[in-house]
């Protein structure tokens, strides 16, 4: 067994779980579904997780095409993705992570179909998760790693489905303090992952600048 598979699987799981953040989504989900029955909530959660998974899979497999089409370098995307993920992690560390701010009138507007937006996109499948999916797909050099990535994403959304379905009971068990502690811990993990992502993108660019500088000087002289 390849020794890199387990660390890669752990990276996929921790990063996607913190970015999807089903525990942090629970209070918002309960607010948006206030007055609905458990059956209605379950239907919304099922559709939201399916929509999120399909959306993420589109970016996983179409990431390379999008890079070529828009002329985006992998390293540049790593840097931008690192910044986005770091900002999300920082907000979570402050226990003030809000995937999407909703006013009362907006909640009523989305009540008919909140499973797609805002619950599915961007709460469960936001820019951070999309950036993370594309970057990790770039790092998947073997079919085994690609399989682990896809399987982990499927597992995360399966867990998200069960967590949100049981959100009423979990909120009572965790309480506000427990939810804040969990959010801060996941935020710290996310910030570390973001720094690694940023550095991995910045290193090749800085190396090119360092190599090209002597060449430019010799050309001028």
Write out the residue ranges for each language-model feature.
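Small-residue-enriched transmembrane helix starts and helix-helix packing motifs
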Residues: 1-18, 95, 102-120
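Juxtamembrane transmembrane-helix termini in multi-pass membrane transport proteins
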Residues: 8-58
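Structural signature of hydrophobic alpha-helical transmembrane segments
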Residues: 9-25, 75-83, 148-160
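Transmembrane-helix boundary and interhelical-loop signature of multi-pass inner-membrane proteins
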Residues: 37, 58-81, 160-204
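A small-residue-rich subset of transmembrane alpha-helices
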Residues: 39-64, 140-172
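Membrane helix-loop-helix hairpins that form the core translocation module of multi-pass transporters
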Residues: 42-96
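Transmembrane helix exit motif
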Residues: 84-105, 193-204
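Single conserved hydrophobic/aromatic residue that forms the stacking wall/gate
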Residues: 209-221
